[in-house]
Amino acid sequence: MTRSLKKGPFVDHHLVAKVEKAIATKDKKPVKTWSRRSMVLPEFIGLTIAVHNGKQHVPVYVTDQMVGHKLGEFALTRTFKGHPADKKVQKK
């Protein structure tokens, strides 16, 4: 179910403060955040945001096509290693 339009997008206030500070100081270091639930706003375009995936912070460069999506969509949490190979001896 989608979010109601009258509520507006959700962004953690501490993330907005960090982004505004990075824009004001023209800092190129990634903005580190644990807030995967925050929505990407147009102010984030051109910044690198380091999103936590449960193990490490994944750098995500924000483009205009990402606006409206959540930050967690761009930092995958699960790694698929592939199914194990069949270890049975093959007959010739």
Curated annotation (Swiss-Prot):
Asked whether the keyword Flavoprotein is assigned, the reply is no
Superkingdom field: Bacteria
> Could you tell me the Gene Ontology terms of the biological process aspect for this record?
ribosomal small subunit assembly; translation
Span-the-membrane segments of this chain are none
* UniProtKB keywords: Ribonucleoprotein, Ribosomal protein, RNA-binding, rRNA-binding
InterPro entries tied to this protein: Ribosomal_uS19, Ribosomal_uS19_bac-type, Ribosomal_uS19_CS, Ribosomal_uS19_SF
Q: Which molecular function GO terms apply here?
A: rRNA binding; structural constituent of ribosome
Matches recorded under SUPFAM superfamilies = Ribosomal protein S19
State the GO CC annotations. cytoplasm; small ribosomal subunit
Q: Which Gene3D superfamilies match?
A: 30s Ribosomal Protein S19, Chain A
Give one Pfam family. Ribosomal_S19
Keyword Ribosomal protein annotated: yes
| Function summary | Protein S19 forms a complex with S13 that binds strongly to the 16S ribosomal RNA.
NCBIfam families registered for this protein in UniProt: rpsS_bact
Record's family? Belongs to the universal ribosomal protein uS19 family.
Q: What is this protein called?
A: Small ribosomal subunit protein uS19
Source organism of this protein record: Acidovorax ebreus (strain TPSY)
- Gene that codes for this? rpsS
